Amino acid sequence: MIKVICVGTIKERYFKEAAEEYKKRLSRWTKIEEIEIKEEDENKYRNVEMLLKKEAEKILKHIKEGQYVVVFDINGTQLSSEEFAELLDRKVSKGEEIVFVIGGSNGLADAIKKRANLLISFSKLTFPHQLFRILVYEQIYRGFTIIKGIKYHK
């Protein structure tokens, strides 16, 4: 099973449709659970660290002992699509649950990064939160097509 925990929601219909399409495609190979954590209102907190701490508490409630946690972070390791597929294959073939965590516009608290088994960076570029979620789903889908030998990845 794959769980995707996201801080914030997708607002634009076309991004929602893209996410749903990838989740539908993936459903033939794995169960996908998406959890949206409400992004905290910056005006309620004295500083960003307090805001991130509150979001981290909400995220950690959805991560169980023994789950393999992958956090997306600009300073993480960059993987090729083939390496990402190998990671998926290693974990899914053993029946392990993988949890992908996507931070909000303020990033993620250190507590989440410390809980991670792996920090991954797709790029040094900054992406809009909603678009990044689609990129994650696409890479998970691409990974499974590589694993299954389906012609999609070139």
From Swiss-Prot:
InterPro entries: Alpha/beta_knot_MTases, RlmH-like, tRNA_m1G_MTases_N. Keywords: Cytoplasm, Methyltransferase, rRNA processing, S-adenosyl-L-methionine, Transferase. It is found in: Cytoplasm. Its main location: cytoplasm. GO terms for molecular function: rRNA (pseudouridine-N3-)-methyltransferase activity. The keyword Cytoplasm applies. GO terms for cellular component: cytoplasm. S-adenosyl-L-methionine binds at G103, F122, S123, K124, L125, T126, F127. Specifically methylates the pseudouridine at position 1915 (m3Psi1915) in 23S rRNA. This is Ribosomal RNA large subunit methyltransferase H.
